[in-house]
Amino acid sequence: MIPKRIAGVHTDTSGVPGMFEGAARISYVDPTGKVWVLWGTEPVDSQGQEVFLPEGGWDDGEAAVDFTEQETVGRFGAGVRGWKVPAFDGELSLWIKGDKRPTVQAWQRWQRAWTAFQPFGQLRVMSEAGVNRYANVQLRGFSKPEFFPRGDVLMEHSVSYRCLDGCWFGEVERFTGNVSLSAGGDLPPLLKLRWDGSATSVRFPAGNTVSLSSIGAERIINLDRGYMGQITDADGNVDSQSWSVLRGVIGGVEIAPGEVANFKLGAGLTLEVTPRFLSPWR
């Protein structure tokens, strides 16, 4: 995709058929919350837009499942002993052009929008149906420019990143009361219980019921496998005291894609379900 006009304050970056199939908009959200629109299928009023993603500018940026196989007892095939989803890498090849400022200043501003330390920025892909996918991305490196341009001329630039989560996330769904959950996505979803801190109880898909005593403050219980019911406050700080009481009582809950699981949530509990995907295009 070649910009139709380089000079002036507006560059048309409307998409063409076949480019980023199924996507409507691609953007980057930096840790401060600023949204950098990089590409769109419809003409975008790019007043103020300084970073553009051309056709062919998206490299890698998709997850993969690493299966551990073992021989079967019979003569045919193999069985799966386990699996994991490792972190993945990606790279964006971009064009930068200053809007009401020299391009080199826009380039510097764009670089400051990325970080190698938490909180990371997010790459977001919105589909034509308005469905969002996002990945938390850690800066791994920038390309070095061959020269520093003067004025508002176009500048080529690339940024490499790593997604430590190993997946793309979808939009959070929230449930209360009796829940029959059918897991979507490509991978088991991220499950969390948002608890208002009042005395209540929850029955898990395995059939076990856990009672929660009042603690007088909102908490989040992470049901992801490996976290074993870790309890944090709204800012993500671990509540060691509350967690120690429930450690060994609440385990991880893993629901395979397409599997149906039933929860019974008492008053003050909300189940938050975040689907996981291997690719933003799915």
Across the structure, where does each feature detected by a protein language model lie?
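Polar/acidic, low-complexity leader/linker segments enriched in S/T/G and N/D
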Residues: 1-67
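Intrinsically disordered, low-complexity segments enriched in serine, threonine, and glycine
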Residues: 2-5, 167-282
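A short, compositionally biased
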Residues: 19-24, 115-121, 195-199
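Short amphipathic beta-strand/extended segments with alternating polar/hydrophobic composition
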Residues: 35-42, 46, 133-141, 209-216, ...
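Oligomerization/assembly interface segments of phage tail-like spikes and tubes
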Residues: 70-104, 151-167, 260-261
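Solvent-exposed loop and beta-edge segments used for protein-protein assembly and interaction
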Residues: 84-88, 115-117, 151-153, 185-187, ...
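Short, acidic/charged, Gly/Pro-enriched secondary-structure junctions
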Residues: 93-140
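Short beta-strand and beta-hairpin "edge-sheet" elements
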Residues: 122-167
